[in-house]
């Protein structure tokens, strides 16, 4: 092989705006999936309740998400993030049409990071409660309740999975916006 052959290369036929447009389409797709994950988590947790049947109608044990302020915060946080993601779809579509927009990408990075903090905070706090529901804490006499409230625990655990998946998707959105901005600054 000759040394000159290595220097000869073919230029990419993909334009830089085409790559940015592809990244913007991926951004839109990820936002839609994140909406589904966070909204599904809010709905699943918000409709979680279970009543244990007993011999008498006067004594009933009931578990509802609203009994725990942490779960209420989880539902509100996921609902806020879902609403934000729906509103941000407009900017995501704008970026498909105008791939060189910088100010709106910076705004999206800022708001995506704020929503990531809110979503992760709600999911992490609820994860601690779900862990206690599954495992308990013998030192403080908090016994596991998931043997009795099986459906309640399955729904809350599933809600956490959707919420943490939404967190990962928002991290990807932040990376995509940062990459698109860095590609634009390198071109100027």
Swiss-Prot record:
Residues 46-72, 127-159 are extracellular. Glycans are attached at residue 49. Keywords: Cell membrane, Cell wall biogenesis/degradation, Glycoprotein, Membrane, Transmembrane, Transmembrane helix. Residues 1-24, 94-105, 181-188 are cytoplasmic. InterPro entries: CASP/CASPL (IPR006459), CASP_dom (IPR006702), CASPL (IPR044173). The keyword Cell division does not apply. GO terms for cellular component: plasma membrane. GO terms for biological process: cell wall modification; cell-cell junction assembly. Pfam families: CASP_dom. It is a multi-pass membrane protein. The chain crosses the membrane at residues 25-45, 73-93, 106-126, 160-180. It is found in: Cell membrane. Regulates membrane-cell wall junctions and localized cell wall deposition. Required for establishment of the Casparian strip membrane domain (CSD) and the subsequent formation of Casparian strips, a cell wall modification of the root endodermis that determines an apoplastic barrier between the intraorganismal apoplasm and the extraorganismal apoplasm and prevents lateral diffusion. Belongs to the Casparian strip membrane proteins (CASP) family. Homodimer and heterodimers. This is Casparian strip membrane protein 1. It comes from Solanum tuberosum (Potato).
């Amino acid at each position: 092989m000759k040394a000159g052959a290595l220097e000869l290369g073919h230029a990419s036929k993909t334009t830089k705006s085409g790559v940015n447009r592809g990244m913007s389409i991926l951004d839109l797709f990820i936002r839609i999936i994140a909406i589904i994950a966070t909204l599904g988590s809010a709905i699943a947790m918000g409709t979680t309740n279970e009543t244990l049947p007993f011999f008498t109608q006067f004594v009933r044990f009931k578990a509802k998400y609203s009994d725990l302020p942490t779960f209420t915060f989880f539902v509100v946080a996921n609902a806020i993030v879902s609403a934000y993601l729906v509103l941000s779809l407009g900017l995501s579509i704008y970026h498909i049409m105008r791939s060189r927009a910088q100010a709106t990408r910076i705004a999206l990075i800022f708001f995506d990071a704020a929503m990531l903090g809110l979503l992760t905070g709600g999911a992490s706090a609820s994860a601690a409660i779900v862990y206690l529901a599954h495992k308990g804490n013998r030192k403080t006499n908090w016994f596991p309740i998931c043997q009795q409230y099986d459906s309640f625990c399955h729904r809350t655990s599933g809600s956490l999975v959707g919420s943490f998946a939404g967190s990962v998707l928002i991290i990807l959105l932040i990376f995509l916006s940062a990459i698109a901005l860095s590609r634009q600054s390198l071109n100027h």
